[in-house]
Structure formats: C-alpha cells, structure tokens
Amino acid sequence: MKRRLMKGISLLTLVFLIGIMLQLSLKSELTAYASSDDPYKQRFLELWEELHDPSNGYFSSHGIPYHAVETLIVEAPDYGHLTTSEAMSYYLWLEALYGKFTGDFSYFMKAWETIEKYMIPTEQDQPNRSMAGYNPAKPATYAPEWEEPSMYPSQLDFSAPVGIDPIYNELVSTYGTNTIYGMHWLLDVDNWYGFGRRADRISSPAYINTFQRGSQESVWETIPQPCWDDLTIGGRNGFLDLFVGDSQYSAQFKYTNAPDADARAIQATYWANQWAKEHGVNLSQYVKKASRMGDYLRYAMFDKYFRKIGDSKQAGTGYDAAHYLLSWYYAWGGGITADWAWIIGCSHVHAGYQNPMTAWILANDPEFKPESPNGANDWAKSLERQLEFYQWLQSAEGAIAGGATNSYKGRYETLPAGISTFYGMAYEEHPVYLDPGSNTWFGFQAWTMQRVAEYYYLTGDTRAEQLLDKWVDWIKSVVRLNSDGTFEIPGNLEWSGQPDTWTGTYTGNPNLHVSVVSYGTDLGAAGSLANALLYYAKTSGDDEARNLAKELLDRMWNLYRDDKGLSAPETREDYVRFFEQEVYVPQGWSGTMPNGDRIEPGVTFLDIRSKYLNDPDYPKLQQAYNEGKAPVFNYHRFWAQCDIAIANGLYSILFGSEQANDSFITPTSATFDKNNQEDISVTVTYNGNTLLGIKSGSSYLIEGVDYIVNGDVIIIKKEFLAGQATGSISLLFDFSAGLDRTLTIDIIDTGGGEEPVEPVEPVEGVLIIQSFNANTQEISNSIMPRFRIYNSGNTSIPLSEVKLRYYYTVDGDKPQNFWCDWASIGSSNVTGTFVKMDGATTGADYYLEIGFTPQAGTLEPGASIEVQGRFSKIDWTDYTQTNDYSFNPTASSYVDFNKITAYISGNLVYGIEP
C-alpha cells in the first residue's frame, strides 16, 4: 500500500511538472512572437495567454469558456459559470487571430471540436428517431406569447394556422440526418443547478434554459429548467406546465439557438481560413462545419409558425414565410420516449443580431456556400434584406433603432393605424424583451455595426459606406475622451418616434431619434466599437476614426489592466432583485429544483437559487443590501476580454505596418486660464510627415491667426483660446500619414469670468446656461442644441417666464420645424419658436427661442433642468453650422457657454447677444 501511494505521488508530481513545463514553454513561444512586434500585437498575445492560464479560471476542466471568471453575476446568464453560444463564438474568433499571429491553428481546431462536443446537441441529445417524426407540413402547434410571466402557461391552440417548412427536406437530403446542426444558447458548464446531462443530475455540462415567459420576463423572473425534461425534476409535469398549457404532457427535449452567435462563429471561421492559407494550414474540414451551420441557420429567416410575412394571419406556403433576416432565435425539440418533433423560426427581428458579413460569406465564398440547393441563394437574399433593414432603422442622428416583428404583440394581432412597417412587419422600439428594453444597451450598436464595417472593408459596398459615414459621425459626437485620460461611451440609449415605412429608399428618418441617457465604461462594448472604427478607418481613410479607436484601446489598457485581463468597476443597482424580486409561480403549482429548493407561489430569485448563499461574493452582496447600498463588482467576462484582445490584434493587422510613420506631439494635454492668458507650445516629432492642419471639431484653425508653426514647435495662440468656452476642448493635429494626434486643453477662468446680467424685479433669480451641440458636423440638415438651465439664485423662478435663444444662420430661408427630443420636465412642456432677426449680424440671421408652458412648473434655487432640442428646415436642406454664432464645435458635454442667451420676463440675465 505504501509503495502504491508513493507511486501515485510520483505520478502526480510528474503531471504537475509537465504542466508547468508546458506553460513555461508556451510563455517562451509567446514572448518570441511578441518581442519585436508592435504593442497591439503584444497586447493580444498577453491577453491570449492570460485567458488560457488555468490559474485565472476562464476555462472549465472540459475546456469550455465560462461566461465570466466570477460566479456571482446576473445578466443574460444568471450565474457566472454558465456559458453561452456567444462566448463559444468569441472563443473561435480569438483562436483564429492567434493562428494569424503564430501560425498555430490547433487552438482554433480545438475550439470547433469543443463546440461540436458540447454546444451543438449530439444525436444522443436530439435522437434522430424523434427528429425523423417531424412533419414539415405541420412544424409546430401555435401558442400565443404574452407580456407578463403571470399570464403563463400559454394554452396550445391546435386550430391556429401554421405554415409549411420549406427547407427541412433539403437539409435532410443534403446531410443525411434529421437532427439540427446549430448551437443551443445556454450551458450549465459545471452542472451548478444539478439537472445533469439528459436529466442524470450528475454529469456536466448540461443544456438548460431560462427565458420562456414573455417580453416583461427579466432574468430576475425566470425559472431555470432542463432542456432534457423527462418529467422527473420540477413538478408533476416537470417544468413544462409552467410555460405551455396542454391536456397532457410528454417527456421531451427542446433547444434554442441564438442566431447572432452562430453567425459570429461562421464569420470567425472565414478569417481563420484566410489566415491559415498564409501559413499553409488546411482548415477545409472546419470550413465545412461552418458552412453546414450556416445552412441550418436559415431557420432564423422564417416566421415563428411559418406564417406569411406582412400577412401574418395566413399560413405560409414556403418562402412567403421568410423575412430573410437574422431573428432572435430558432428552436426545435421532440419526444424522449415517443417519435415526434417540432421546429419553429422567430417572428421578432433585432438590428443588433444582423450580420451582413456572414450573409456575404455564405452567399459568395465558394468554400463556404452551403451544400443544400437553396442555401447560397437564400443567403444572397438575406444580405440584400439586411442592408435594407439597417437603412430603414438608421435614426436621424445615425444610430440604429430596434427592429421589427411579423407577430404583433406575439399574437399576430392586427397592426394599429400609423405604425411604420418593413415589408409588412411592424416597427418595434425594443424587440423581444422590455425589462430592460432590448435596444437600450449601446453594445448592440457596436456589435452590429462592427459586422457592417467588416463587410464594407471586404466589399466596398456603398450602401454600407453610407450607413457607416452617418453612424461614425454620431459615434464621434457621443464618445467622450476626457482630459484626465479617462473615457466614456454611451451606456443606455433612449428612442423616440419611428422610421418612415420602408419603400426601398432611405429617407433620413426625420421622425426617428436617439439620445444618450447614461454613460459608462463597458469594456467589451468599447472593444467592439474600436473594432468597428478600425475597419471603417482602414477602408474610408478616416484617420479621426482610427485615432478614436486607438484612444479607446490605449485608455482601456492604461486604466483597467489587471492580472486577469481588463476590468472596470460596476455598480449594480439591480442586485437588490436578488432579495426582492418575486418569481411568478401559478397558484397550485409546486415543485423543487434539483438541490431541493422549493418552487411555489411567493418565491424570490434567491429562493430558487439558494446555492448563491455559498458563493464567495455573497457576503459582499448581503452587506451592501443590509446597508441599502448598491454593490460594486469587477468582472472578467470572457466575451469582453476577447473583444478587447481582438480589437488590439486587429489594430496590429490593419495599421501595425504604419507604426514607424506615426507623428507625435508633446504634451498631449494642457490647461489655459482666461485670467492668466499664455500661449500653449506643442513640440512635434514629424517622422517624415507634414502637418496638414489643426481641427477643432469639424473646423480647421487658421494658421497664422489661431496658431503659428515654428519648425518643430506649434504655438496655439492665447487669443484663440480666450475665445473658447470654459470646459474641455480637443484639437486634432491632422498629419499627412500615420496617426493623427489629439491635444486636450482644459479652459478655466480663475477670475470667475463675466458676471451674468442680473434679472429685474419681480424675479430675483440668476440663471446659468450650459450647453453643447449633439451634432458637430460642419454641414448638417439638423441642428441639435442641448441645454442645461441652472438656478444659481436664492428664489424660485417660474419656467413659463424663461426664454433661451440659440442664434444661427438659416442658409436658405425656408419654414422650419422644432422638436424637443427629451426634457427633464417633460418634452410636452417645452416650446420652440423661430424668429427672423430684424438685422442680420455675423453668425446670425435667425434665432430659435425656447420657452416653457405653465405646466413646466418652477425652477428652485440650486436646481437645474435639461432640454434636448433639434430643428431642421421643412425640406431638409442643409445648414452650415460653423457660421453660426451659438454653435460650439468643441464641447461634447455641458459647459458654460455665453453665446446662448437667457431671459426672465424679457430681461437678459445670461449670455451675450450677437
């Protein structure tokens, strides 16, 4: 016995030593790859190594990437050591890029094999004998969707019309199987919930699901359930009768695909194949897997119950049920003990899921064209339809709005009068879910437009170019690069209005608008945004876009680097729902989770997830809740780390060879005091380039007036700086080649500046007006002033007595329209009047006068309100904003600006009239 024990210890020691040697060998190889290369390639390889370091905890023992290193995290997955098809698709993309840099594509191959083994249900998980019982003439039984979880279970309706599935037979004929080749979206990697593989309660990983009960069901209101429901766990009918009403229930399997993840996997495989050829590596067998996945992904192009698009009360007869877009899901299932099956598409389409890059690959690349008779043609149609979809949804500002549905309210209800449509499908501000609204998250903007930018890079399609030109202009106006080296990107967006009904031509959507309601530092979204900007910059030659991408990458790296990757602190206000969110369970229903947690009316999120009580971060959560505070966490999401790594690697690929030609400036930040005025000197290292000019916003400074060039020294004149509003301005040094550079200057006034004019009796308050322009383009068909009105006095001010004036040149006298997109006192309480001035002055022949209704109330001492305005000419002809007196091209957030005037009871109290 002693000898055996010693032998075992020796073997364990040997394995441990081999592991250390392999890790050291890998580090040595990576050091060799990165040692003489540019910093962006080095960053990619550093992050790749940290993601693969077992001590950092990104991967399970099965080699599956977790959603996050941390376990206490609730978003789409409700536990950190679940994973998603999204994470798996990023895994492929990461390894494709690693192969590009090192020539080693074995990690990419392993990623595909992991997907096939664990994420695509095997024949054991979706028995072919059951799937062979599917009838494409009767794909599934209709069940209406409802808004609230409390309206479930949803009763099956066997009499409702259901159309014909036109692709099933050709898929069976092409691939010789009845099973579906697509990823299920959610995996319990370590079997935390305890359902097990095929309900054995033990094995891992296990296919699970959560969302099932309508648009208002947040993750906090879900009941986790197994995909293989043999009725032995849960209640008397397993979990089935929580969701669907039927006369009797059968043991069954059911899986849901997230189409954006499968599309990303195909996109990643395309680039892996291109880069592998550079190294003489053959990836043809993995290309075939991606092609096959794309063939089945066509199910996402069809209405949920294969009803006609635009005539959704009628059953479809084939392709008349195809919207040709990437919808929110497709799903399938069948009997465990009986041979029957069903397949559904999805009626709801989100702009954030579209992928014209993947559509182009599957339609045009001979290696990727699906083997089925109609696969490539369907993807060619999808490409055209997706590009139209983006055009239809692009707001007046440039952001992409939500999406459309062929099943209004999820029940194929008649469309209300006046709703905008796309091929007969109704506009939806937030497709699929409303808690929170699905298109509030800025990340969808970055994700979806990254694919458009990549497609533009590959094809030069002018439709993509036009979409990106407008979108990137909007991005430049809303991303903040602060003078202290920090950055902010939009966090949440708010939408108003709707697009024009689609007739085949983009109208500019004058009635569809977006505003930013919060800012943050979502690192994954910032990485994806940088990726999009880089592809756009490379193709269009827009160096300002490249510089913005570079700033995001550099600032993330400098601010948020840690020993596991990158992470920013997150304040989680929603975590109060751990304790307070009741999960709806129908009266009379009772059952248990695998660990014994009771499922019954009145339970909370935590009640049916009691294993969280043993999580290492739970005491922190509990303490914050007891103190009435929102806890702050640092997370390492796998997809976000990949997005950052990939963006850095992409910078190396697209611009790495140009590093030696970059120019530099010193300093990159400075301060100008209006009370102690001095020129600012900047030293330039040209590296063979020439300075084309210096830009403030979209306008160039005047050499010899605003600045002087004296060899390697640029002098920014104090006279120019004195004319700027207090706050922060950015000056872009535009070089003939390589990177442009940005000088950030804080404008301060230690002398206090000009005193605002005191109002006359009877009102004693004093107003301070801060403002900025949401659209700083030189030429634009819309002017978008933003105002913050602050009462710095000691008495209340009736807002109905307050007026603001924004001065501008009309540039072609036409009738004009004003809109209040948002106001903290309610948009309906804001008025806008256009006044033609008796005598034109420099920068002004008109002013917009903002007023307030009596219902707006009063502005109390120390309080402020915000107004987001917008105006345009009735024929949408352009304004030249740089000529306008009140236009501020440099501010991207609220700053004091005395070229906006304010009046109380007709008396000037703030600002300088032109």
From Swiss-Prot:
Domain of life according to the entry: Bacteria
Database matches in SMART domains: CBM_3
InterPro entries in UniProt: 6-hairpin_glycosidase_sf (IPR008928), 6hp_glycosidase-like_sf (IPR012341), Carbo-bd_X2 (IPR005102), CBM2/CBM3_carb-bd_dom_sf (IPR008965), CBM3 (IPR001956), CBM3_sf (IPR036966), Endo-1-4-beta-glucanase_dom2 (IPR023309), Endoglucanase_F_dom3 (IPR027390)
EC number in record: 3.2.1.91
GO biological process: cellulose catabolic process
Cited Pfam families: CBM_3, CBM_X2, Glyco_hydro_48
Keyword terms, alphabetized: Carbohydrate metabolism, Cellulose degradation, Glycosidase, Hydrolase, Polysaccharide degradation, Signal
Protein name, UniProt field: Exoglucanase-2
Natural source organism: Thermoclostridium stercorarium (strain ATCC 35414 / DSM 8532 / NCIMB 11754)
